[in-house]
């Protein structure tokens, strides 16, 4: 409550307008852009308005839009407006007007009139405080100018977070650099938003200007780029979210700005922002489209060029290059847009935009399209804006669009007609026709149909055969191709036949020569015909000799151009067609046809499909032939004359027919479309229908046939034999791809069928592989994978074959084969049977741990880590750990002697090697177990605990932490236990669980990971097998308190939560089952947690203890936790905050139960033999704390809980809405607590600290009651005899009222009725302290509720005013009573008057006694002045006459008393209130009456009296001053006579001169302020009287008195002329005569008259200097004063007097010369001055004195410098004097004259040498 009140008061103070704080008001008034603070502070609003209105008028002449402000903020009425007195709605309207003006004036702030006008807003309307944001943003574009420094100086200190960046620059008064503003816009969201909103608001009002928009665009663009750069992140989702946040901030700004088309410069700035967004924000296409539409929707004829530039950048970032329709239409509507594109293309990348426009223009439907689009596209292309490649891209778009229109039949009219005309036009262009042909090739359109539609020829004739691939094009370049073919063919015509088949293994030079020739000749039929007739190919015997066909088979299966390979297949087809009548068996070609059907080229596949059809027709003719007589092509020689060809598998013709016709032919067209389809088909055919999955079966339905297993087996072997024998690795790869998918058919698997391929491949060298890759252009890695896929996973022999191939001769294996082999093992692993897996795993483990072959061991380890090991395998591995270290149990740690002895180095080393080996093995095995879903294998528990035992032994032996091994082992156990918890029915053998080992890990390990895992394991075991761990669980909590609880990471938090959730409940239940006290039994646990509190991260504390108490049971344990907290941490704020939060979560009943048990524990603490307190708090133990201190800490903590928890609220809810039983229980519990507290308080009455703590607890306990119940309780307690207790409860009520916000009528009435009880105490109690408490409480009641019933407060005020309070001799009760009356004055207002007859005299007497006393009683002094101030505020008319005189007299005495600084402030504040509030006549008369009393008390009293008069003049109307001017003049005369009276030789105890000077300065100030409020009619007679009083008021014999009075008078006149200036120059006529007289008799070297001499000269200087009415030009006035004044030069007779004359007299003479301003007058003055420049003139001593001549020269010099050529018009008269003075005997005179001459020459621009000769 207290903090809430403090916050409210702070908020009120922060927003206070300081209406009573004069200093603050003056400071606020002195804030100005054009005046210094001192000057600004002295100006009134009339003066300010006059200056500022001039600037406003000039602005109106510049811009008529300013004229509207004449009616409001620049009207005469505005001078009296005060924002502090306006309502909220009025201020809001004013804000709107001010912002409109600032928006308009922002463009002209560098002009003086604008600054003047803005200064009026600052001075009158305080825009720098009320409209700080708008004003700052108005000035911000000028942040590099001196104007901004002036602006910074007036900014308030409490800038919001939005503009906090400017605070350092305000304090250091330096200009903020641009980068700082950019950085703030980048990082400060509110500043960025404020800047954007300001610019938009100004632009909407049409007040924007170039400087503002440029500044905004530059800052915002850089800031946006910085924000987007900062949004980048390593995580894509975070970066996306960050960039979305930036877009959310900038897109609304762009949306609003684009709508302001009348602000084209602003729109261009938005284009810049769009460019930044496009380049940095990775926008999606739809966002870019919206931006592009916004850009085109915002541009005008003045800025569309910038818009097109922006569009070009946006279009580059799009993935889909077409543009929105609105964008295209907007571009087409622009004038001369083609020329703009031409101009921009040289500077910006507009290609993307142009291509997008072209694409979008041709995408419209032909019948609906805009007819202007196609001509626009034609112009874009024909203007050569695009490069050749870009033009080809554009033409390709046109061709594709035209092709689409062709298909739709829309080429006859509309867009189709326009496009056809445009294409014809391009075809006729010399520059575009070649590009159009290339575009035709790129577009892939049907050239023939296009030519027919356009009725023209689009490209020249090409070769007779269509050419598709780029490789072949390189060979067929017209005549070059003809020559190359001839050259290649010539040697082949005579070549000898050395080959039997080109499919034989090994390289063939002849084949390479033939292939080269065929490539060159494949382009024309003639060359092909010549080629196939080559004798070397044996074309005449294609059936008998495989050479002819084998060439073309190898060619179309090789890496050759597509067209050539297609021709090769067609030649084979032609050959077979020619042999159709010979019934030949051509099944030898079938594998190669299948390979061709899997070729990537569609043309090859299509030609191969045609070939397969021929084979099918041929097979249908031969299917019924006798196989024994059939002629099979290539049989025995297909792969050469060798064993390879003999072992090739062939099938009967009828089976071939079935395979081709029924299996392959139905899906023939699918093979052409999909190169993988033939493989899928054959896989399905061979595997049969039962082995197919649903998707395969669906695909195979098209074959419509199911072959029997023997046929499928034969087909499989047929294809496998060709895959094994063929030397073409491309064919081998394509066959293996589907053969490996077959896997097994019957008892035959692919490993058996393809073993030869595997064996051959394994032996190939790297060089051979490279030759394969280079020669056939295939991936050997892919081929290697297919070869290794031959290994059938379900055949252990096959797996063994692979394993032995990898390990038997591992060093000679290729690295790629090793890697691929282990990858294959990984693939087959899931298919292994358990026994096979176990065998293979053991062998791999052995290899992994071997040190012989690092690569092999690494591969084996990688395999074991990557596969999912089964339960038997990992159990076998785990058992190997214990089997490998059987004797470790007998080993202990080596003794220190053995460890340090040099003689034992060898044995130790050997032991280290053995240990290292064991550790490596253990580590690897545990890692494997950990990664193999060990949670599914509870059978591992026994072995894991054995391993844990081994690790502990190794720790002792090696003195190592073994953290990693322990973490692995415990982690595996934890995963098993966690799985066990989730399956309660699962049975696990718990006999092998060793809780002691886990606890040992917790206690001895230093690794947080090990500790946390062990704790989680204990928590898990406590849930599923509590009997195993509870007996040893306490050390865990001790450890947690010192370790885990202190960690600040999420994992540790999880550990703690699970430990609490799973260990604590069974532990408590176990204690209950044993019928032990649960609190005592868990004290160690509680101690661990409470001790660790300070180390627990703050954000986790509350959640942790909530969980702990919930699991323990709050009814039993909450009080214990609170007590242990309070005992250990006392009043630590963090602990108290946690306790408060914990208590607040409980209901009222639980809180009351907790506090009752808590108080019982406090009572037990103070017992001689404590019980529970000894266990929980250590009371009575040897190292325990003092029980009394413990009790104090506990009680203080309880007080805090009662004060800050929600008990009161929850009790109120219980009483209001609870059941009767709940209410009764709550009442009973509260009564018990109250009884306990009272009893405890009684029992510790003699122990002051504990008793004090009890009283505090009692008070806070009572604070939980409602105010009505609280007052009732207080009344009961006040009936007790103990005054100490009564004081406390009254103080409690006061505190309660101080923090209470009870405003209900019942509470108010009850508290006000309590005043009678307090009055009774005042009247009857002899205890002063009790009375003091009662008065304080009365004051608080009056302050809170007094206005509800003033009569009751008045009754109390009367008692306080009387003898029972103010009449008491005790100082404290008097002070309290006076302060209470001051407070009541505010409450009662005029109602306080009945108390004044008794109160005010007593107060004045008390003040008089205090001032008369020898000791300093500042408190009573201040209290009296507090009452006086309150009365002056609320009933000022009661302070008059005698009361006023007493107050003034005592105040004068107080000023002469040595009091504290605060006391002086209180007195001065009261005097200021007196001046402001008391009737002005009474105030002036009172000061005048008591003037002598003030003088008697010293200068300070006089100064304060004058301050009262000055304030009264200031704060009251002019009429009040006019009416009381006579009294004021009397007072001023007294003040002006102080010098005469106080500095008189007859007055020994008077003021010193400094004090008199200060008093006169204040009196002058009072006089001037009085004069300001008088008019000339009133003041002139007064001035005449004052002059007469000063000049002739004293007798001529009183020389000293006259000098003193004249001195004061002329000092006043100096201020008078200096302040009022030209207004009062005419008053000089009244004092000329007196001034001349003074000049005649006063001397600067005479102490008695020196001050008067100085005053007269300074007065004259001010009068001369401010003459604007030509007063001193009058010969009469000038003549009377000039000569006496100039004669003062003669007083310069020595160095000191020369300095005085130079400092005072000469400047005055110069000012007179300036005021005289006439050649005649100047001549007259100069004549007199020159008299003092020549010896023999002047007074008795004349100018014979060099100092006099020097003074005259200095005077002439200053006149020359000041008046320049005007004065030098008298140069002819001065030249003789100058000549004489240049020869003067005195060096100083001569030197000064030379300076004067130089000054003259400077002005005239010529030398005086000729004139002086």
UniProtKB/Swiss-Prot annotation:
<keyword id="KW-0690">Ribosome biogenesis</keyword>
<feature type="repeat" description="HEAT 10">
    <location>
        <begin position="1398"/>
        <end position="1437"/>
    </location>
</feature>
<comment type="similarity">
    <text>Belongs to the HEATR1/UTP10 family.</text>
</comment>
<dbReference type="InterPro" id="IPR012954">
    <property type="entry name" value="BP28_C_dom"/>
</dbReference>
<comment type="subunit">
    <text>Component of the ribosomal small subunit (SSU) processome.</text>
</comment>
<dbReference type="InterPro" id="IPR040191">
    <property type="entry name" value="UTP10"/>
</dbReference>
<feature type="repeat" description="HEAT 9">
    <location>
        <begin position="1309"/>
        <end position="1347"/>
    </location>
</feature>
<feature type="repeat" description="HEAT 4">
    <location>
        <begin position="584"/>
        <end position="621"/>
    </location>
</feature>
<feature type="repeat" description="HEAT 8">
    <location>
        <begin position="1265"/>
        <end position="1302"/>
    </location>
</feature>
<dbReference type="GO" id="GO:0034455">
    <property type="term" value="C:t-UTP complex"/>
</dbReference>
<keyword id="KW-0677">Repeat</keyword>
<protein>
    <recommendedName>
        <fullName>U3 small nucleolar RNA-associated protein 10</fullName>
    </recommendedName>
</protein>
<dbReference type="Pfam" id="PF12397">
    <property type="entry name" value="U3snoRNP10"/>
</dbReference>
<dbReference type="InterPro" id="IPR056473">
    <property type="entry name" value="HEAT_Utp10/HEAT1"/>
</dbReference>
<feature type="compositionally biased region" description="Basic and acidic residues">
    <location>
        <begin position="690"/>
        <end position="705"/>
    </location>
</feature>
<dbReference type="GO" id="GO:0030686">
    <property type="term" value="C:90S preribosome"/>
</dbReference>
<dbReference type="Pfam" id="PF23243">
    <property type="entry name" value="HEAT_HEATR1"/>
</dbReference>
<feature type="region of interest" description="Disordered">
    <location>
        <begin position="887"/>
        <end position="912"/>
    </location>
</feature>
<feature type="repeat" description="HEAT 2">
    <location>
        <begin position="389"/>
        <end position="427"/>
    </location>
</feature>
<dbReference type="GO" id="GO:0000462">
    <property type="term" value="P:maturation of SSU-rRNA from tricistronic rRNA transcript (SSU-rRNA, 5.8S rRNA, LSU-rRNA)"/>
</dbReference>
<feature type="repeat" description="HEAT 5">
    <location>
        <begin position="659"/>
        <end position="695"/>
    </location>
</feature>
<keyword id="KW-0698">rRNA processing</keyword>
<feature type="repeat" description="HEAT 3">
    <location>
        <begin position="428"/>
        <end position="464"/>
    </location>
</feature>
<dbReference type="InterPro" id="IPR011989">
    <property type="entry name" value="ARM-like"/>
</dbReference>
<feature type="repeat" description="HEAT 11">
    <location>
        <begin position="1678"/>
        <end position="1715"/>
    </location>
</feature>
<dbReference type="InterPro" id="IPR016024">
    <property type="entry name" value="ARM-type_fold"/>
</dbReference>
<feature type="region of interest" description="Disordered">
    <location>
        <begin position="686"/>
        <end position="705"/>
    </location>
</feature>
<feature type="repeat" description="HEAT 12">
    <location>
        <begin position="1769"/>
        <end position="1806"/>
    </location>
</feature>
<feature type="repeat" description="HEAT 7">
    <location>
        <begin position="1189"/>
        <end position="1228"/>
    </location>
</feature>
<dbReference type="Pfam" id="PF08146">
    <property type="entry name" value="BP28CT"/>
</dbReference>
<dbReference type="GO" id="GO:0030515">
    <property type="term" value="F:snoRNA binding"/>
</dbReference>
<feature type="repeat" description="HEAT 6">
    <location>
        <begin position="1058"/>
        <end position="1095"/>
    </location>
</feature>
<dbReference type="InterPro" id="IPR021133">
    <property type="entry name" value="HEAT_type_2"/>
</dbReference>
<dbReference type="InterPro" id="IPR022125">
    <property type="entry name" value="U3snoRNP10_N"/>
</dbReference>
<keyword id="KW-0539">Nucleus</keyword>
<dbReference type="GO" id="GO:0032040">
    <property type="term" value="C:small-subunit processome"/>
</dbReference>
<keyword id="KW-0687">Ribonucleoprotein</keyword>
<comment type="function">
    <text>Involved in nucleolar processing of pre-18S ribosomal RNA. Involved in ribosome biosynthesis.</text>
</comment>
<dbReference type="GO" id="GO:0045943">
    <property type="term" value="P:positive regulation of transcription by RNA polymerase I"/>
</dbReference>
<feature type="repeat" description="HEAT 1">
    <location>
        <begin position="245"/>
        <end position="283"/>
    </location>
</feature>
């Amino acid at each position: 409550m207290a903090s809430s009140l403090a916050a409210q008061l702070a908020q009120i103070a922060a927003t206070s307008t300081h209406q009573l704080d004069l200093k603050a008001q003056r400071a606020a008034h002195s804030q100005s852009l054009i005046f210094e603070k001192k000057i600004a502070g002295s100006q009134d609003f009339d003066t300010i308005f006059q200056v500022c209105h001039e600037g406003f008028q000039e602005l109106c002449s510049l811009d008529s839009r300013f004229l509207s402000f004449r009616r409001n903020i620049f009207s005469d009425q505005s001078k009296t407006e005060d924002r502090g007195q306006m309502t909220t709605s009025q201020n809001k309207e004013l804000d709107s007007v001010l912002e409109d003006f600032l928006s308009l004036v922002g463009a002209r702030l560098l002009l003086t009139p604008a600054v003047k006008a803005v200064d009026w807003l600052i001075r009158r309307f305080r825009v720098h405080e009320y409209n700080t944001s708008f004003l700052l943003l108005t000035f911000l574009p000028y942040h590099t100018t001196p104007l901004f420094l002036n602006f910074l100086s007036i900014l308030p200190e409490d800038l919001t977070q939005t503009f906090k960046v400017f605070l350092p620059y305000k304090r250091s008064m330096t200009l903020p650099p641009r980068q700082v503003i950019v950085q703030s816009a980048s990082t400060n969201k509110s500043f960025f938003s404020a800047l954007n909103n300001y610019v938009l608001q100004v632009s909407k009002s049409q007040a924007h200007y170039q400087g503002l928009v440029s500044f905004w665009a530059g800052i915002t663009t850089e800031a946006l780029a910085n924000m987007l750069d900062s949004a980048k992140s390593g995580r894509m989702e975070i970066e996306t979210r960050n960039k979305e946040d930036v877009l959310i901030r900038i897109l609304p700004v762009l949306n609003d700005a684009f709508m302001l088309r009348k602000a084209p410069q602003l729109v261009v700035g938005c284009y810049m922002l769009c460019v930044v967004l496009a380049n940095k924000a990775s926008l999606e296409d739809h966002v870019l489209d919206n931006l592009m539409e916004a850009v085109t929707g915002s541009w005008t004829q003045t800025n569309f060029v910038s818009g097109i530039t922006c569009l070009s950048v946006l279009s580059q970032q799009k993935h889909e290059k077409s543009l929105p329709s609105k964008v295209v239409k907007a571009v087409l509507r622009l004038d001369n847009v083609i020329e703009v594109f031409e101009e921009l293309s040289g500077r910006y990348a507009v290609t993307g935009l142009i291509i997008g426009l072209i694409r979008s223009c041709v995408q419209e439907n032909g019948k609906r399209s805009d007819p202007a689009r196609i001509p626009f596209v034609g112009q874009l292309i024909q203007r050569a804006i695009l490069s050749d490649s870009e033009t080809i891209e554009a033409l390709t778009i046109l061709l594709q669009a035209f092709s689409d229109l062709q298909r739709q039949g829309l080429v006859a009219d509309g867009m189709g007609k326009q496009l056809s005309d445009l294409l014809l036009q391009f075809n006729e262009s010399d520059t575009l026709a070649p590009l159009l042909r290339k575009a035709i090739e790129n577009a892939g359109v049907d050239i023939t149909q296009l030519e027919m539609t356009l009725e023209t020829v689009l490209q020249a004739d090409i070769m007779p055969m269509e050419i598709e691939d780029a490789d072949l094009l390189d060979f067929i370049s017209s005549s070059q191709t003809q020559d190359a073919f001839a050259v290649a063919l010539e040697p082949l015509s005579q070549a000898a036949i050395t080959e039997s088949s080109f499919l034989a293994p090994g390289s063939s030079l002849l084949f390479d020569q033939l292939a080269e020739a065929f490539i060159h000749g494949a382009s024309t039929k003639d060359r092909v015909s010549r080629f196939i007739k080559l004798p070397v190919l044996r074309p005449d015997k294609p059936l008998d000799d495989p050479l002819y066909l084998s060439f073309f088979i190898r060619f179309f299966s090789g890496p050759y151009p597509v067209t050539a390979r297609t021709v090769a297949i067609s030649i084979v087809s032609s050959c077979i067609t020619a042999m159709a009548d010979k019934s030949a068996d051509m099944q030898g070609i079938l594998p190669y046809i299948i390979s061709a059907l899997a070729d990537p080229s569609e043309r090859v596949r299509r030609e191969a499909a045609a070939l397969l059809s021929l084979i099918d027709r041929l097979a249908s003719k031969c299917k019924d032939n006798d196989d024994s007589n059939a002629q099979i092509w290539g049989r025995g020689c297909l792969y050469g004359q060798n064993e390879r060809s003999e072992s090739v598998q062939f099938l009967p013709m009828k089976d071939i027919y079935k395979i081709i016709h029924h299996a392959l032919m139905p899906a023939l067209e699918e093979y052409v479309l999909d190169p993988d389809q033939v493989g899928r088909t054959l896989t399905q055919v061979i595997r049969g229908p039962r082995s197919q999955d649903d998707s395969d079966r669906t695909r195979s339905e098209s074959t419509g046939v199911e072959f029997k297993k023997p046929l499928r087996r034969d087909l499989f072997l047929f294809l496998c034999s060709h895959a094994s024998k063929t030397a073409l690795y491309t064919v081998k790869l394509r066959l293996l791809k589907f053969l490996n998918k077959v896997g097994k058919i019957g008892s035959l698997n692919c490993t058996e069928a393809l073993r030869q391929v595997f064996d051959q491949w394994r032996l190939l060298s790297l060089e051979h592989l490279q030759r394969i890759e280079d020669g056939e252009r295939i991936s050997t890695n892919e081929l290697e994978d297919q070869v290794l896929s031959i290994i059938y996973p379900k055949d252990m022999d096959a797996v063994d074959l692979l394993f032995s191939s990898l390990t038997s001769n591992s060093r000679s294996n290729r690295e790629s084969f090793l890697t691929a082999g282990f990858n294959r093992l990984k693939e087959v692993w899931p298919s292994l049977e358990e026994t096979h897996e176990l065998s293979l795993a053991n062998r791999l483990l052995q290899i992994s741990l071997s040190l012989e072959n690092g690569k092999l061991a690494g591969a084996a380890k990688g395999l074991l880590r990557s596969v999912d090991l089964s339960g038997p395998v990992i159990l076998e591995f785990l058992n190997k750990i214990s089997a490998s270290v059987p004797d470790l149990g007998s080993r202990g740690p080596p003794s220190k002697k053995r460890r340090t002895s040099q003689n034992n180095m060898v044995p130790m080393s050997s032991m280290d090697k053995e240990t290292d080996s064991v550790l490596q093995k253990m580590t690897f095995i545990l890692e494997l177990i950990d990664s193999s879903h060990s949670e599914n294998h509870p059978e591992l528990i026994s072995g894991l605990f054995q391993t844990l035992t081994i690790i502990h032994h190794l720790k002792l032996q090696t003195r190592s932490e073994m953290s990693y091994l322990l973490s692995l082992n415990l982690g595996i156990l934890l995963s098993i236990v966690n799985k066990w918890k989730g399956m309660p029915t699962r049975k696990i053998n718990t006999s092998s669980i060793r809780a002691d080992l886990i606890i040992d890990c917790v206690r001895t390990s230093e690794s947080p990971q090990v500790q946390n895992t062990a704790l989680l394991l204990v928590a898990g075991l406590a849930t599923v097998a509590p009997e195993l761990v509870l007996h040893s669980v306490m050390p865990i909590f001790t450890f947690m308190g010192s370790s885990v609880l202190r960690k600040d990471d999420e994992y540790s938090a999880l550990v703690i939560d699970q430990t609490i959730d799973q260990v604590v409940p069974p532990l408590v239940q176990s204690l209950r089952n044993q019928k032990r006290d649960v609190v005592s039994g868990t004290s160690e646990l509680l101690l661990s947690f409470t001790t660790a509190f300070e180390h627990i991260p703050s954000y986790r504390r509350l959640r942790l203890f909530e969980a702990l108490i919930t699991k323990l049971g709050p009814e039993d344990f909450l009080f214990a936790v609170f007590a242990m907290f309070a005992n250990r941490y006392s009043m630590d704020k963090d602990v108290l905050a946690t306790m408060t939060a914990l208590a607040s979560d409980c209901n009222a009943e639980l809180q009351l139960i907790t506090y009752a048990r808590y108080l019982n524990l406090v009572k037990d603490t103070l017992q001689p033999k404590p019980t529970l307190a000894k266990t929980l708090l250590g009371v009575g133990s040897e190292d325990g704390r003092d029980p009394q201190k413990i009790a104090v800490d506990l009680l203080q903590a309880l007080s805090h809980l009662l004060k800050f928890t929600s008990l009161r609220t929850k009790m109120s809810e219980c009483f209001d809405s609870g059941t009767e039983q709940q209410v009764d229980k709550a009442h009973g519990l509260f009564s018990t607590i109250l009884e306990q507290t009272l009893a405890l308080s009684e029992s510790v009455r003699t122990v002051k600290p504990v008793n004090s703590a009890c009283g505090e607890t009692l008070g806070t306990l009572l604070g939980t009651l409602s105010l009505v119940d609280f007052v009732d309780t207080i009344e009961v307690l006040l009936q007790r005899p103990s005054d100490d207790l009564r004081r406390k409860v009254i103080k409690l009520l006061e505190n309660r009222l101080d923090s209470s916000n009870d405003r209900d009528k019942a509470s108010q009435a009850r508290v006000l009725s309590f005043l009678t009880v307090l009055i009774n105490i005042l009247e009857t109690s002899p205890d002063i302290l009790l009375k003091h408490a009662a008065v304080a409480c009365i004051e608080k009641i009056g302050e809170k509720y007094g206005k509800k019933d003033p009569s009751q407060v008045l009754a109390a005020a009367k008692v306080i005013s009387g003898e029972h309070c103010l009449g008491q001799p005790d100082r404290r009760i008097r002070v309290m009573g006076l302060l209470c009356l001051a407070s009541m004055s505010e409450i009662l207002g005029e109602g306080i008057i009945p108390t004044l007859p008794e109160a005010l005299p007593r107060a004045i007497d008390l003040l008089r006694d205090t001032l008369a006393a020898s000791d300093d009683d500042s408190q009573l002094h201040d209290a009296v002045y507090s009452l006086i101030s309150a009365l002056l505020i609320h009933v000022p008319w009661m302070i008059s006459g005698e009361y006023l005189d007493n107050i003034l007299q005592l105040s004068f005495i107080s000023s002469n008393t040595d009091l504290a600084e605060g006391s002086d402030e209180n007195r001065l504040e009261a005097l200021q209130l007196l001046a402001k509030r008391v009737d002005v006549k009474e105030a002036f008369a009172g000061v005048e009456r008591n003037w002598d009393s003030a003088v008697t008390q010293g200068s300070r009293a006089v100064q304060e009296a004058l301050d009262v008069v000055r304030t009264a003049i200031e704060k009251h109307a002019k009429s009040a001053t006019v009416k009381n001017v006579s009294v004021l003049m009397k007072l001023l005369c007294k003040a002006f006579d102080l010098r005469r009276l106080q500095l008189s030789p007859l007055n020994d105890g008077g003021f010193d001169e400094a004090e008199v000077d200060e008093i006169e300065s204040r009196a002058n100030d009072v006089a001037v302020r009085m004069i300001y409020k008088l008019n000339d009619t009133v003041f002139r007679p007064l001035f005449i009287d004052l002059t007469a009083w000063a000049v002739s008021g004293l007798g001529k014999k009183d020389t000293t008195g006259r000098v003193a009075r004249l001195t004061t008078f002329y000092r006043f006149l100096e201020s008078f002329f200096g302040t009022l200036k030209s207004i009062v120059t005419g008053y000089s006529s009244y004092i000329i005569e007196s001034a001349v007289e003074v000049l005649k008799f006063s001397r600067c070297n005479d102490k008695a008259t020196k001050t008067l001499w100085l005053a007269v000269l300074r007065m004259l200087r001010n009068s001369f200097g401010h003459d604007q009415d030509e007063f001193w030009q009058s010969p009469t006035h000038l003549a009377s004063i000039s000569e006496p004044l100039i004669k003062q030069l003669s007083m310069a007779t020595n160095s000191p007097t020369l300095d005085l004359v130079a400092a005072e007299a000469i400047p005055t003479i110069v000012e007179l010369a300036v005021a005289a301003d006439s050649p005649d007058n100047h001549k007259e003055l100069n004549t007199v001055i020159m008299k003092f420049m020549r010896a023999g003139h002047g007074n008795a001593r004349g100018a014979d004195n060099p100092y006099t001549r020097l003074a005259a020269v200095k005077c002439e010099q200053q006149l020359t410098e000041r008046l320049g050529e005007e004065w030098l018009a008298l140069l002819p008269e001065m030249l003789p004097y100058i000549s004489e003075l240049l020869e003067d005997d005195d060096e100083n005179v001569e030197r000064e004259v030379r300076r004067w001459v130089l000054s003259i020459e400077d002005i005239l621009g010529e030398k005086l040498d000729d004139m002086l000769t």
